[in-house]
Amino acid sequence: MISRLACIPVALFALSGCAIHQNVKPVERFDSKVVCIVDNPSVRATFFDAYERALTNKGYEVKKLASGASLVECPVTSTYTATWRWDLAMYMAYADIVVYKNAKPAGKATYDASRGGGNMGKFIGAEKKITELVDQLFPRLAGS
């Protein structure tokens, strides 16, 4: 009986290693309908495309800035990074989107499946996950 009870914490600990974490601090309302995104050439181009599409669908106009551009080039600027891994198939293991208003942090979305282990949820399509993050990061339509 005691050995069975001892197995419970071990099982819970093992399962916690298969966790996918997502944390979003949404942006507050701002008047600008333009979001400038600083290009990150070390990330797959499909990430930028999905991010741009998700913002456009919410009514924002997207302006692409060159890699290394200053955060003060636009009133609302965003940076991003992401990594992919292989585990039976390619999947987006990590994504981080930061939004700045007047060069100060205004919102952030982080998705981390790098410790997803046997969790099959990590195989969600990158575009679907990016859209979900953008919908949570920008809860309102542009200008509302």
PLM feature spans:
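N-terminal leader/targeting segments
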Residues: 10-11, 107
